[in-house]
Amino acid sequence: MSEQDFREIARNGLWRNNPGLVQLLGLCPLLGTSNSTVNALGLGLATMLVLACSNAAVSLVRGAVSEAIRLPAFVMIIAVLTTCIELLMQAWTYELYQVLGIFIPLITTNCVILGRAEAFAAKNGVLRASFDGLLMGLGFALVLLVLGGLRELLGQGTLLADMHLLFGPAAADWKIQPFPQYQGFLLAILPPGAFIMLGLLIALKNRIDESLAERAKVQAGDVPATQRQRQRVRVTGVIE
């Protein structure tokens, strides 16, 4: 696997084909658990682990599974890995597991995981499949984390609250309150706020993509006629 392959997979997972901002997959957990940073980070890490491990497992067994039972077999693999993550969370982060509730078992049915297993892991080697799962999971987790941080900041005026649920008592003092007198904005932590914030993030990404595309065209010498005309007016003072 070449360095170019690694870069291409990384760009797709983190930005160009991001599961949350481009593919719009996994919206149920993305919107349902992103009301705080700790919830978003906990579910994001769990999803990333399941996605990376399931891609590796699917790639390993892809030659031994027939076409007729491929999807049920993939779902079984994902379900086993999700159960393992669920048991680990019950053992080490039980309070966070209780907060996340049904969203942990629902990782099994997350379209991001099954989609990558079918579209990529079943057609590539273990290394490529594992890296794709890791980067797709990381891209999904980052969107969850940004969304959770923004909603927590706007809704409650805090950041990193209750991080001890994930990292233990040592993280109890990680809470940040930038505006002590801020009373909070209830809409931000309600479901409508999740839709609004996700829409704004998608719009921001699209705008950045447009700016990058325009800059690439300019650097390549493909400047639009109207822009060339404006540049000529600034130089000559004559409108043609």
Swiss-Prot record:
Transmembrane region(s): 41-61, 71-91, 95-115, 130-150, 184-204
Chief location bin: membrane
Gene Ontology terms: cellular component: plasma membrane
Xref: Pfam families: Rnf-Nqr (PF02508)
Keywords: Cell inner membrane, Cell membrane, Electron transport, Membrane, Translocase, Transmembrane, Transmembrane helix, Transport
Top-level lineage group: Bacteria
Keyword Cell inner membrane recorded: yes
Membrane topology note: Multi-pass membrane protein
UniProt-annotated location(s): Cell inner membrane
Enzyme category, top tier: translocase
UniProt EC number: 7.-.-.-
One of the GO biological process terms: electron transport chain
Presence of the UniProt keyword Transmembrane in the record: yes
Function of the protein: Part of a membrane-bound complex that couples electron transfer with translocation of ions across the membrane.
Subunit and partners: The complex is composed of six subunits: RnfA, RnfB, RnfC, RnfD, RnfE and RnfG.
Similarity section: Belongs to the NqrDE/RnfAE family.
Name the UniProt record assigns to this protein: Ion-translocating oxidoreductase complex subunit E
Origin organism lineage: Bacteria, Pseudomonadati, Pseudomonadota, Gammaproteobacteria, Pseudomonadales
